[in-house]
Amino acid sequence: SLDKNLLLFLLLLPSVFSLFGLWFVVKKIHSRSLISIITSRKKFDFKRFKFGFILWSLISISIFTLEILIHPDDYELNFNFLKFLILFLISIIMIPVQSILEELIFRGYLMQGFSVFFKDLYLIKKVKGEVVINIPFIRIMPLFTTSIIFGLLHILNPEIQKIGYGLLIYYVGTGLFFGIVTLMDEGVELSSGFHASNNLVASLLVTA
């Protein structure tokens, strides 16, 4: 079987190519700049990303530490310096790329795409003289749709197989939270920081 670190690297590697693929679709097919699906600001706000990353890391580590103190028997120390170093290098480089990619796809590209779709649906219904769906409903549909898709894409995760499909509620809820943050802040920088931190802490602390 493949080494776990090598397997992690191979699983994350497609994210790099997918990022270029997303750029190609946005730039060449939609004739838009990548920044247009990232933020309403002129450029990516790294301060927001950094703030989100640090805040979520502090919260996650605090909860994880508290969980260990309350249920110490549920955890086992499994530390190998060399393997951890390799894991750290892979994670610190690849996981932020993968997390930002997911935010760009779900909270950027798809959120905007579904907004256009549901807006057109609203206009069609209005023209035909049918019952008009109220605007707030139209606005939240892209949020719920992208969150459900985001949650379902985690259905093959190992923890789902062990704990059960009920855990999908957590992923859908996380998608909703990231989506709300994106809508309120008018950009994916904060949610990308939260997402990268969440995945990085899980990779380094839980699986290490």
Where are the language model's segments positioned?
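Alpha-helical transmembrane segments and their lipid-water interface positions
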Residues: 22, 63-64, 107, 202
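Membrane-embedded alpha-helical segments of transport systems
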Residues: 16-17, 58, 197-202
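Membrane-water interface of transmembrane alpha-helices
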Residues: 16-33
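Perimembrane helix-loop junctions in membrane proteins
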Residues: 30-34, 71-75, 106-107, 158-161
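Juxtamembrane helix-loop-helix connectors linking adjacent transmembrane helices
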Residues: 2-5, 10-12, 34-101, 111-131, ...
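Transmembrane helix-loop-helix hairpins at the membrane interface
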Residues: 88-208
